[in-house]
Amino acid sequence: MEFPEHSRHLLQCLSEQRHQGFLCDCTVLVGDAHFRAHRAVLASCSMYFHLFYKDQLDKKNIVYLNSDIVTAPAFALLLEFMYEGKLQFKDLPIEDVLAAASYLHMYDIVKVCKKKLKEKATTEADSTKKEEDTLSCSDKIECLSDGSSHMAGDLPSDEDDVEEEKINSKTDLATESGNMWIRLSSDSASIPQTGGEVDTHTTAAGKTADSPCSSTGSLSHRSATSMGDSTDVDCVLDLSVKSSLSGTETLNNSYLSSQEILRNSLVQVKIEREASCEDNDIHTSEYDIERNTVKENVSSNIRAPYEPVHLAPIREDSVLRELDHDDKAINDDMITPENERVQMEANIDNSLLPYVQNILSPAGQIFMCPLCNKVFPSPHILQIHLSTHFREQEGIRSKPTNDVHVPTCSLCGKTFSCMYTLKRHERTHSGEKPFTCTQCGKSFQYSHNLSRHAVVHTREKPHACKWCERRFTQSGDLYRHIRKFHCELVNSLSVKSETLGLPAVRDWTLEDSSQELWK
C-alpha cells in the first residue's frame, strides 16, 4: 500500500522543525546571517554539502559560505526550496540565485535560472524593438501632419463654392516615401499649366506614384482624367484645396513634406558626384534610392516654373553631412579587437610568435615576465621563457674575466644566469626557510610550498577526483585515493583505449594531476 502524500507530509514536518530549531544539527553562515538546518536535508539537495560532510561528519557543525558569491537572501530562498520544493524568486535578482545555485552545485536550479534569464533577454529585446517601431511611426506621422498643415489651413468654408468648383475638374497630387502615402485631393480647378502635358507612368494595378528623388526634386502631377480612379486608392490623408491656392505655394509645401519624409525614412541614398562638375551639376545630382518604387518623370515645361531652387543647397548640405558622419563612423570602427591583438603580439618575443598566434585570444589573459617585463599569453609559455633566464650550464663554467660579473656560488662554484637562481641555490646549502606561515608559524624554502600549505588552514579542497567527485586538500592525497580505489578502473580504461585506438589515459587532463600517478 502506497501513501502518495507521505513525501509532502515529510517535507512539511522537516520545514516546521527547521523553523522551530528542533533537531537542527548544523549552522550555515553567510556573512552575518545564520541559518539553522539539518545536515541530511542539505546533503540530499546540494552536492556541495554532500562532499562537505562526507569526510569528517562530527567536526563540521558550522559551514561558512563565501559571501562574495552567495548572498543571504539567495541562500534563504534555496533553503526554502530544499524544505518545501517550491522556488519563488519574488523580487530577488535571478543572477544572485544563479550564482548561489552554481556555488552549491544545485544543477536543477541553475537550469531554471538560465532559462528565465534567456526569456527575460528575449522579452526585453522584443519590447525595445516595438518601442523603436512606435517611435519611427510617430515621427513619420508628425512629418505627414507638418507637411499638410499649411494646406489644411486653407480649406474652403463655403459649401456652395465647393460644389460649384467640383464640376470643373479635379487633380490629385501624390507623394510616396517608402510605404507612407500622402494624397492631396484638389476639389478646385487644376493648377494652371504653362504648356506641355504631364507624362505619367502607371503601375500594374493602375496606381500612380511620384518619384521624390528625381534629379530636380520636383513633384509630378496626375492628369485630370484620373479623377474617377482616385476613389479606389487607399490614402493616409485626403485634404481638399481651394482653387485660390497658388500652384507654386502648393508645390513648395508638398516638396517640404516629401523632404521631411525622406529624412526620417529608412532609405539608403547614394550620390554620384564628379570632382570636376560645375555648380549647376549640384542641382542635377543623381539619386539612386534602393527601394522598389515607381518612378515618374515630369516634363521640363511643367517642372521649370515650380522648381524650389532655394531648397537644393539645403538638401545637398544635409546629404553631405550624413556622408561625413558615415565616414567618421568607419574611422572609429578601425580600432577593433583584431588591432588590439596585433598590438599585444608586438610586445611578445619574436621567437615565440609562431607558438603564440594560435593560442592568444582577443580577450585572453596575459602573463608578464618579472625579469624582463615581456608579455606572454599563457603560463606555460612564460615558464618556457623563464627557463632561458634560469638555464644552468652543465658542469662548472670557466672562470669569468674580471670585466664580466657572472653569479657564482661561493661554496660549490656553480655559475648561474641571474642572481635569482643563485639565491635559490644558496638555500640548499644554508637550509634557510624565508617563507613562514602566519597561521601556524611553519617555514618553507620556496613560496610555492607555502601556497600549497596554506590550503590546510583555509579548508579548501581544489583537487577533485574525476570518478567519485571526492575532493582533497593536497594533490598527493588525490593520487593515493586514485591508486587505492580506482586503480582497476584506470587499468580497464587504458586497455579499452588501446583496443579502440582512443587516446591513452595518461593523455587525459586531470585537475592538478602529475605523471607520477601513472608510474
Curated annotation (Swiss-Prot):
PROSITE patterns: BTB, ZINC_FINGER_C2H2_1, ZINC_FINGER_C2H2_2
Domain BTB: 24-91
GO cellular component: nucleus
Subcellular location(s) of the protein: Nucleus
Principal place of residence: nucleus
Chain intervals annotated as zinc finger (C2H2-type): 367-389, 407-429, 435-457, 463-486
Name of the protein this chain belongs to: Zinc finger and BTB domain-containing protein 18.3
Organism, scientific name: Xenopus laevis (African clawed frog)
Lineage summary: Eukaryota, Metazoa, Chordata, Craniata, Vertebrata
